[in-house]
Amino acid sequence: MGKPTFQPNNRKRKKVHGFRARMSTKNGRKVLARRRKKGRKVLSA
């Protein structure tokens, strides 16, 4: 068996999937728009 592949790291989580990371690119804004349209309670990490 290998190591567990999920190695939690809150800093990386925010940097990669956070709201400001999403807002910083055109496609990221598309992601947020799509999630708003769908009615997601949580838009980003």
Curated annotation (Swiss-Prot):
Keyword check for Ribonucleoprotein: yes
A cellular component annotation (GO) from this entry: ribonucleoprotein complex
Domain of life: Bacteria
Compositionally biased tracts (Basic residues): 10-20, 27-45
Keywords: Ribonucleoprotein, Ribosomal protein
InterPro entries with a match to the protein in the record: Ribosomal_bL34, Ribosomal_bL34_CS
GO molecular function: structural constituent of ribosome
Keyword Ribosomal protein: yes
One BP annotation, GO: translation
Pfam families in the cross-refs: Ribosomal_L34
Disulphide-bonded residues: none
Region listing for Disordered, in residue ranges: 1-45
Alphabetical list of PANTHER family matching this protein: LARGE RIBOSOMAL SUBUNIT PROTEIN BL34M, MITOCHONDRIAL RIBOSOMAL PROTEIN 34 FAMILY MEMBER
Similarity comment: Belongs to the bacterial ribosomal protein bL34 family.
Protein name: Large ribosomal subunit protein bL34
Origin species: Halalkalibacterium halodurans (strain ATCC BAA-125 / DSM 18197 / FERM 7344 / JCM 9153 / C-125)
